[in-house]
């Protein structure tokens, strides 16, 4: 499946606050993410708590041990809504 991507302002705000090393690691992981956001290397999984809050299925993908990107699907469009530590959805 070919995916389209869109990022919210909140995502870019959070991305800009990340240390340079995490930004670099995120860019590397996005190369995989853009091919398939559900690639097994990313450990993408549903987040029940956020899904209930947003009224749609919300997912998180692991960039590194304590860095996640939070997103949802809108048809074939992947909408990234935030990036940060695991605390984003705890």
Predicted region positions:
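Enriched for short, Lys/Arg-rich terminal
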Residues: 2-4, 10-17, 56, 60-90
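A short, surface-exposed loop/turn module that caps and links secondary-structure elements
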Residues: 32-61
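Short helix-coil-helix linker/hinge
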Residues: 19-21
């Amino acid at each position: 499946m070919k995916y389209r991507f869109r990022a919210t302002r909140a995502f870019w705000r959070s991305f800009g606050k990340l240390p340079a090393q995490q930004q670099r690691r995120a860019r590397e992981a996005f190369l995989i993410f853009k091919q398939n956001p559900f690639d097994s290397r990313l450990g993408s999984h549903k987040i029940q708590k956020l899904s209930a809050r947003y009224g749609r299925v919300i997912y998180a993908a692991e960039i590194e041990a304590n860095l996640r990107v939070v997103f949802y699907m809108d048809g074939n469009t992947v909408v990234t809504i935030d990036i940060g530590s695991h605390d984003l959805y705890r």
